[in-house]
């Protein structure tokens, strides 16, 4: 739809692009000045629509063969085609003629970034900021390069500076939240975003990102309020419904979580996704009958949604219908065998069948998949523990422990695995962070062990 195509662009860009497509792309005749063509080309670059991009650049080159701005955009076409060396050579040749051109410096920053050369990218981006144009966007790019260097503290400073210059850059907002999570400084992010929504009370992205920060800080009720504000501004945002439903799930209010996702089905174009997520919600709660209903609804909307097929297969497995579970999962596998939900379902089915070697093969494929989620990692950890594959569990979970040293899930499994492999000193390291009730189920012997038992934290009394 036209509205969706130009959602993040102003009316002038929209009108120019539509006029270009109506005339030039249909062999018509129309004059555009060089500034207008730059805007048209930049639109196609932004949305990565390569065929009209090529046509727009070729048209501009015919009209303005000596324009350095058009030549810069020719280099960006090479970047879009991942021809980074060609783009770099074109830009360096232009830079020799105009060494102070900030557009050239910015473009060099882009290509150095694509070539994973962050130091050179930072140098060029900062040179590009000298003219004071789009400083917010440039600082956001500089921050991303520092993230690549794993210098998160400096990245956060540049993200905050970027927001000071351009408070409406939603990409910077999202990246800022993500970096605060990595650096474990969500308190700092909270202060910044609370100030941001005071200054920009109608920013859907601002309220949404503040909700994410509240989730990370464990302030679920405040997260719900923030997501509700975001939905009041924009009822068509599927990601806001998803996060609001997750917040309700964390509060234990499955009914509100489900109704939120059903509102997503009513108010957005993502009906199949909404029904699938309701199914996944009920599956996590162990309500396989309700889950199967909503997975079926999702498939009625989108017949080849393999994630919904995988969820339906897991529902059948929980119902005890192994044959139907396996046939449904195999159908999903025949469509997309690399889908993480399909791999997870196949692993669980073969685990339940007692074919642990085949289950392990599916889990091995799942864990190295780029789309593997935290939930999948936890399922894999539990699988390794149940089958006493302790050494592999330790190798896998220690990586998660290093990243999240106070996560009770991995600490609990590590403590039990260390105990069963007689690594008592290692167990002492993680015992302060375990879930005591879960540990007593996994490894009751550790609770009365003369050396380790006294180190197990006292269970917290239930909240009144």
Where are the model-predicted features located?
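Register position in tetratricopeptide repeats
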Residues: 46, 80-81, 114-115, 148, ...
